[in-house]
């Protein structure tokens, strides 16, 4: 019994080992073509099992896919491995199958004006060497760019032309001419880009003005320019009568969320004291006086306005204005006689007065 049990165990172990080998070992009539760079396996064997599967070949398809995947994994395990950060990885070789591109082919770059002219006239570019012989220095130098041969901007002596101003700086003139050539080339490049993208560039005369700026816009621009320094305008000088701009960007200081228990206790006690106090928060006397003052100011403004309106209406009647009784004279509003309104004495030339014949108007003692 013991001998049979040992033999049965050995047979069972061999059977399990054979099943494991059968799971990872797949036999094909034709070897598969592998592209490990793309993790691709191409099976050239004819699917004979699918013909006998009937209308439901799902089981056969799953078995075929499982076998081909197993062969691909077996090939991956044969690659050299290395350890990277406590992990064993295998580096895939370069892919051999050319996959179709994801995006469409790029469009050809549009021709510039010179390229169009050269194609129309049949002009072909001539290839020139990058190095030329410089007779001045006696060595080979670049044809263009930095340290080029026959660099006229590096000469220490320039002959002044006969028709030029003898006091003109020829070195500065040559440098300015080079800057103009560079700017012209940049303008041509931008024009070519605009022509390629069908855009419109501003004219060479410059940009058109955007219009008259208001006082608020100028002030806002000046304020932005002042705070554009490294110190955010803190050490920027001000004009003698310049006003301090409002909203200069000061940060709000909030109370700490925790830690300052004394200040929090003080604020809470002050709030409770105000709520429990019997004294009203509104000063009735002060508010009443303020209201009466505003009403008096409004009435004074109305009287002043009415008096100015009356003066404008009576200005065309004559030098005396509005009068009652008596012939016109040089006085203002009066009743009877040649003088103004008087309680004693004969009528005179003055205005409202008491006693005497003094030729004056209203007089204070």
From Swiss-Prot:
Disordered as annotated region, ranges: 233-253, 280-365
List, alphabetically, the InterPro entries matched: Ribosom_reg
Any one cellular-component term (Gene Ontology): nucleoplasm
Recorded GO molecular functions are: 5S rRNA binding; RNA binding
Q: Where N-acetylmethionine occurs, residue numbers?
A: 1
Locate the compositionally biased regions of type Basic and acidic residues.
235-245
Task: Please outline how this chain is modified post-translation.
Answer: Citrullinated by PADI4.
- Residues annotated as carrying Phosphoserine in the record are 5
Where along the chain is composition biased (Gly residues)? 337-350
**Cross-link Glycyl lysine isopeptide (Lys-Gly) (interchain with G-Cter in SUMO2) placement:** 154, 226, 266
**Cellular localisation:** Nucleus, Nucleolus
Function, as annotated, reads: Involved in ribosomal large subunit assembly. May regulate the localization of the 5S RNP/5S ribonucleoprotein particle to the nucleolus.
What family classification does the UniProt entry report for this protein? Belongs to the RRS1 family.
What subunit structure does UniProt give?
A: Component of a hexameric 5S RNP precursor complex, composed of 5S RNA, RRS1, RPF2/BXDC1, RPL5, RPL11 and HEATR3; this complex acts as a precursor for ribosome assembly.
* This protein's name: Ribosome biogenesis regulatory protein homolog
Q: Which organism is it from?
A: Homo sapiens (Human)
